[in-house]
């Protein structure tokens, strides 16, 4: 069950990122890193599935009154996500999105529903 207590935005985000990490690990992904920040953007979770780097965006909404958690990932956010992933790949592995095997997944939490996992969100 999702806890919607009065937490700061940052601690609430960390709580959902931890829940997403545990969910993905139960589904066979291996944890690499969390909260990787660059000037161009941030990566919530970096996981690995086989030889594929998985860059995970974690989103949460108490309700979908103002749009769903998934709908909140607009074009600008997608570009920042891609830029941050490219930066991480270069600084850690001297690779790029063009050379590395990677994908972009979303784990969304809405109300008390179970997490919604969307593999390969950016297709």
Swiss-Prot record:
Pfam family, one: UPF0102
Entry's Gene Ontology molecular function annotations: nucleic acid binding
Top-level taxon of origin: Bacteria
InterPro entries reported in the protein's UniProt record: Restrct_endonuc-II-like, tRNA_endonuc-like_dom_sf, UPF0102_YraN-like
NCBIfam families: PRK12497.1-3, YraN family protein
HAMAP family, per database record: UPF0102
Family recorded in the similarity comment: Belongs to the UPF0102 family.
Alphabetical list of PANTHER family matching this protein: UPF0102 PROTEIN YRAN
Protein name: UPF0102 protein APL_1363
